[in-house]
């Protein structure tokens, strides 16, 4: 039988994702064959992994990192349903790694009934291969208006009960206040058949001495029969990307060196895979700013256009903010401009998407014209995780010459160059990156996560993901009840 540990939260952004990641690493270093699972994730941050049939598919970045923390190979069973928001009320539905246009068009209640059994398939395959499943919930498990369709929290818990011993912990962000009420209310609203799974409350992001909470934890246990399993200290920079595409608007300056480079990453409404830029925040002397206005681009050295889930929509937003003129002026004055995937497509001459595969129906929509590219969108999405090879880029990018780097591609547009030097190729030799003067566009994601690139461009060594996993695992082992942790993990 497979053991399951469920990480529920009282709210979104309570700390479920990073806590599940830390628990995966604790399990791994105790010798437990563990795997992460989230039945449904909503995020435009995705990674390319293997599907059960051997092909390539997408999962949310959180489960990708959790798998790395558990020291297992990520696959689509770990996040069988991924919702990628396209507008305020619509999302692309990705099932076992592949976008399903028919499901994307369905009302969510009808869709959920079809998705739940598909998600369970992933859980059961994982349970057959692993001794422990660390399940991450979504939002709160006590949204009683959603309970009939909630296969992410409640359905997963019932699948876990059927698979073997199961327990749940409930994490709450105490820094926001109201955690005692949140925990009690969530416990009270849980379905009767699942309330008994809850074996511990966890207060996250606490400032100061946990004794200041007394007698709150004791009174909460008296009312619920559930102990407070731990109080985790506030840690702003835990080294992992935030779940759900959340990011901090505050600019950061990498410690250990004086200011030497200002980098602005644009933050349009449909930004995707923003987590790939997190390592820049740790480069000594690099000032990183998420930018939504022209004022935030004043005095920067680099302007980065990131990936986008809706390229034409984000291009329209960029123009509405007057950022197109700022980017053009920056490039004309010799400033560096980098476009990644959708950002690269915006830098080109035109976008052609008459069937609306990327969101809006557009025919030869003018791009920014800084690269001689024409992008045509089609129904087939390119999903690929493989090394890429730089040729001989020049100017600000010359340090990248000859580098072979791990990368991944998630895109439905094909870009063709009229001119400009192809400076990046995939492992088959196909061009996937072009440069014109100081403007560089690449189809590949994940380049800034490569230590080799950070050394080449900045002469910097930043803490690795594995270091972040170990640090978080240390914190969890220090602050969670040791006996409960041993019982939950089985080791």
PLM regions and their residue ranges:
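Active-site C-terminal subdomain of aminotransferase-like
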Residues: 330-333, 349
């Amino acid at each position: 039988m497979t053991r399951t540990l469920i990480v529920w939260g009282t709210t979104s952004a309570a700390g479920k994702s990073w806590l599940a990641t830390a628990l995966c690493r604790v399990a791994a270093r105790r010798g437990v064959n563990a795997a992460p699972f989230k039945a449904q994730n909503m995020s435009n941050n995705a990674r390319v992994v293997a599907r059960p049939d051997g092909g390539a598919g997408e999962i949310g970045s959180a489960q990708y990192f959790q798998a790395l923390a558990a020291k297992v190979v990520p696959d689509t069973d770990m996040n069988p349903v991924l919702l990628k928001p396209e507008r305020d009320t619509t999302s692309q539905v990705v099932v076992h790694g592949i976008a399903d246009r028919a499901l994307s068009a369905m009302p969510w209640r009808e869709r959920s009934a079809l998705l739940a059994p598909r998600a369970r398939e992933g859980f059961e395959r994982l349970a057959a291969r692993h001794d422990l499943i660390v399940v991450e919930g979504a939002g709160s498990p006590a949204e009683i208006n959603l309970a009939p369709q909630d296969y992410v929290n409640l359905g997963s818990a019932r699948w876990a009960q059927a698979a073997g011993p199961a327990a749940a912990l409930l994490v709450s962000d105490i820094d926001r206040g109201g955690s005692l009420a949140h925990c009690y209310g969530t416990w009270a609203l849980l379905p009767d058949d699942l309330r008994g799974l809850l074996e511990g409350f966890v207060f996250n992001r606490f400032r100061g001495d946990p004794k200041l909470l007394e007698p709150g934890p004791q009174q909460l246990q008296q009312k619920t029969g559930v102990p407070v399993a731990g109080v985790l200290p506030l840690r702003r920079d835990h080294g992992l990307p935030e779940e759900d595409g959340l990011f901090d608007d505050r600019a950061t300056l990498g410690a250990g060196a004086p200011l030497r480079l200002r980098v602005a990453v644009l933050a349009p409404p449909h930004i995707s895979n923003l987590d790939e830029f997190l390592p820049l925040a740790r480069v000594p002397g690099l000032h990183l700013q998420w930018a939504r206005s022209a004022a935030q681009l004043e005095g920067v050295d680099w302007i980065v256009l990131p990936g986008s889930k809706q390229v034409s929509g984000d291009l329209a937003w960029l123009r509405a903010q007057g950022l197109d003129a700022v980017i053009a002026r920056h490039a004309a004055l010799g400033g560096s401009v980098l476009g990644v995937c959708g950002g690269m497509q915006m830098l080109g001459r035109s976008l052609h998407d008459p069937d609306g595969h990327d969101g809006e129906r557009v025919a030869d929509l003018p791009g920014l014209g800084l690269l001689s590219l024409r992008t045509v969108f089609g129904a087939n999405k390119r999903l690929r995780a493989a090394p890429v090879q730089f040729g001989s880029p020049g100017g600000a990018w010359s340090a990248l010459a000859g580098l072979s780097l791990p990368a991944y591609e998630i895109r439905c547009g094909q870009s063709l160059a009229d001119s400009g030097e192809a400076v990046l190729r995939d492992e088959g030799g196909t061009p996937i990156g072009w440069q014109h003067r100081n403007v560089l566009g690449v189809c590949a994601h994940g380049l800034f996560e490569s230590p080799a690139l950070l050394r080449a461009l900045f002469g910097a060594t930043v803490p690795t993901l594995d270091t972040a996993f170990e640090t978080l695992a240390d914190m969890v082992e220090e602050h969670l009840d040791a006996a409960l942790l041993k019982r939950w993990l089985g080791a």
